[in-house]
């Protein structure tokens, strides 16, 4: 099965299914000498793991990561890093009622059309459970970026349904179960999620992530633009249906004199571009947003078909997130870190000796 690897110089390959015995990742390209431990990875995994609040899936997975290779005496060796997380709370019987039907809005139908077969237990390989390994691999990239290069990655969920963040305090996102930067909206979010659970339904969300301290010059021309890789990274996350870089789709209503990020010797006057110009980092804050659809795993009956094309009605049982965006922030941050470290290594490989004609202006 192709499509299980991401990155060029810093590459992560994941494996495993939602209801299989374990999930795993192979991380290639991490420079040697980086101090790293299972505890470093666990901090990020604990932010993503299921069952941590009553507003997410009640599947309880400890998501305890094991480093199998590539680390010796607390430092990366420069060789392949092997990571493993065991699944411990599968309830495959919850999915026996959909073994012969396709859940509308899920990958059941398309996987069967592609492979002629599917793992119906929790979505198998198409489950968001896979993203645990992205977070583990991304934690390695994140620590390198922070420790070696001083790059700070952060983000949060800025909208769930019609509840929007009106103030943005990114230092508070880990203080509430929604990763929401506007704590005044938390009661409204609690009411919304409780109502969705009562109705057996779900809702979409918007997640935004940022990177401060990225120097100018990262990214490759044309097909390997850094914003193109960011878009691919975010679109590869389950349920993501749209990605914005900088002002994104708002540029439709902007005039040229509004959108262009004017420059002075003292720095940029705006950041509509989201820190990327011509596919190459500008030195400004990188800003990426994504829209996540409402999950189709709901208790409201829906029309579908069976394995032989016959009409069927589907009700999805099991333990599911009423809003998948609630746990998406650590995943998006991890993918941002992976893209940035990959492009840092690519840039260093070709352009390490390049000296620009003048110092970069402040972002």
Swiss-Prot record:
One of its GO terms (biological process) is aromatic amino acid family biosynthetic process. Pathway: Metabolic intermediate biosynthesis; chorismate biosynthesis; chorismate from D-erythrose 4-phosphate and phosphoenolpyruvate: step 7/7. Keywords: Amino-acid biosynthesis, Aromatic amino acid biosynthesis, FAD, Flavoprotein, FMN, Lyase, NADP. CDD domains: Chorismate_synthase. Its EC number is 4.2.3.5. It catalyses: 5-O-(1-carboxyvinyl)-3-phosphoshikimate = chorismate + phosphate. NADP(+) binds at residues 48, 54. One of its GO terms (cellular component) is cytosol. One of its GO terms (molecular function) is FMN binding. Its cofactor is FMNH2. Reduced FMN (FMNH(2)). FMN binds at residues 125-127, 238-239, 278, 293-297, 319. HAMAP family: Chorismate_synth. Homotetramer. This reaction introduces a second double bond into the aromatic ring system. Belongs to the chorismate synthase family. This is Chorismate synthase. It comes from Alcanivorax borkumensis (strain ATCC 700651 / DSM 11573 / NCIMB 13689 / SK2).
């Amino acid at each position: 099965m192709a499509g299980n690897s991401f990155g060029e110089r810093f590459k992560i390959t994941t494996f495993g299914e939602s209801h299989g015995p374990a999930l795993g990742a192979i991380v290639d390209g991490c420079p040697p000498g980086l101090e790293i431990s299972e505890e470093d990875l666990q901090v990020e995994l604990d932010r993503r793991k299921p069952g941590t609040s009553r507003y997410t899936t009640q599947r309880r997975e400890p998501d305890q990561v094991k480093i199998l290779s590539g680390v010796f005496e607390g430092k990366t060796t420069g060789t392949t890093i092997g990571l493993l997380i065991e699944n411990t709370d599968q309830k495959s019987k919850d999915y026996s009622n959909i073994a012969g039907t396709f859940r509308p809005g899920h990958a059941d139908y398309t996987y069967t059309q592609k492979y002629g077969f599917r793992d119906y237990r929790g979505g198998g390989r198409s489950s968001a459970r896979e993203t645990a390994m992205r977070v583990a691999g991304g934690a390695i990239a994140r620590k390198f970026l922070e420790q070696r290069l001083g790059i700070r990655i952060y983000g949060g969920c800025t909208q769930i349904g019609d509840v929007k963040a009106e103030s943005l305090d990114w230092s508070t996102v880990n203080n509430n179960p929604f990763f929401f930067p506007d704590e005044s909206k938390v009661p409204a979010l609690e009411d919304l999620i409780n109502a969705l659970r009562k109705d057996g339904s779900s809702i979409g969300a918007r997640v935004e992530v940022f990177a401060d301290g990225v120097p100018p010059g990262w990214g490759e021309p044309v097909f390997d633009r850094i914003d193109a890789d960011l878009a691919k990274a975010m679109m590869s996350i389950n349920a993501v249906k749209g990605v914005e870089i900088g002002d994104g789709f708002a540029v439709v209503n902007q005039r040229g004199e509004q959108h262009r990020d004017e420059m002075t010797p003292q720095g940029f006057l705006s950041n509509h571009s989201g820190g990327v110009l011509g596919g190459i980092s500008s030195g400004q804050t990188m800003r990426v947003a994504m829209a996540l659809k409402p999950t189709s795993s709901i208790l409201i009956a829906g029309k579908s078909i069976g394995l032989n094309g016959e009409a069927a009605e589907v009700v999805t049982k099991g333990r599911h997130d009423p809003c998948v965006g609630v746990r998406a922030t650590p995943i998006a941050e991890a993918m941002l870190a992976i893209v940035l470290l990959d492009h840092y290594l690519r840039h260093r490989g070709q352009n390490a000796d390049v000296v620009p004609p003048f110092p970069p202006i402040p972002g």
